[in-house]
Amino acid sequence: IRAFHGHLKEAKYVYVAKGSAIVAIVELDNVESPSKLQKVERFILSDKNPQILFIPPKYANGFRPLEVDTRIIFFSTSSLEESKGDDYRYPADYWGKRIWKVEDR
């Protein structure tokens, strides 16, 4: 699991090129101390059903690969230099552990 980090200005596009993954996003109401009551949205992205997920600014995101050798590509609207001062990180279980639970498929 790699989570959570967010940006106030930067948006991202996420694509799974190989395998599948849970991608979770949550709106940041306050970057210094976000509410743990914010609703987390989960998406299953897979190479079997190709989709691009848009993550707007003011959202935190994270992911959990569901298969060995899963390949995830993140596209950013900011350069690496621009995003350095716009990076906020939170523990993977900040909004609960159930986010990363894999239900029977």
Model-derived features: where do they sit?
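Conserved SET/PR-domain catalytic core that frames the SAM/AdoMet-binding pocket
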Residues: 48-63
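Non-catalytic, conserved peripheral segments adjacent to functional cores
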Residues: 1-48, 64-105
